[in-house]
């Protein structure tokens, strides 16, 4: 990925980095980390936060719809990620930065409340890109990815290791967000509504992702970031997540 390589090169050379994304598939165009292939496996490495971001929504609109769905999945994940971070602080494993929380919350709330008729509407794409960009800023303020990456991202990172050919990051994250929102019992109606009404679930169902892979990923999730303490770092919540994968009505139409 050009942006990831550019961010990492800027980090190594200590140079300013201007991000010009051509799709809205994730918040990667604004974050201070890069996803690179290392020995054939996708790996997160430190990178340079964008000095500036230039986005042409006409270009974003012409990208395949799967990239928009991926961006939707990555954006909605801030709901469960923030809840994980707050839970982590309650358990004594972290210290929440309230300003970073405020920015990440405003980003996701602005997005989910945007009126639209099509995911290719100008306003919808603008809000999606703006909100994804704000996510990167929240991470920079927090000094970590905690405001925007929680248990749902751990499932996706585990899938990256399990699958020979992983799906788009935001697609995996979106499904994992639905799972974790129900495990957390937190805003799951909002998450389900957004993913259903945008067509995300319908698209995800065409990919024929496997239940067994998600179950393996849930078990593997804590080992991805052992220094964190998300809901999935506790066995009872892992069991609840796996039960959902096997029994949830929505997931029964998506996973095979």
Predicted feature locations:
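C-terminal charged capping/lid subdomain of soluble metabolic enzymes
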Residues: 75, 185-256
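N-terminal small/polar loop signature for handling phosphorylated ligands or for N-terminal nucleophile
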Residues: 1-18, 117-125
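Short helix-capping/linker segments at secondary-structure and domain boundaries
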Residues: 79-88, 143-146, 183-190, 227-229
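Generic hydrophobic alpha-helical membrane-span motif
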Residues: 6, 27, 62, 158-159
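Short glycine/serine/threonine-rich phosphate/pyrophosphate-binding segments
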Residues: 1-8, 26-29, 148
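Generic enzyme active-site microenvironment
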Residues: 2, 54, 151
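A glycine/threonine-rich phosphate-anchoring loop and its flanking beta-alpha core
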Residues: 11-107
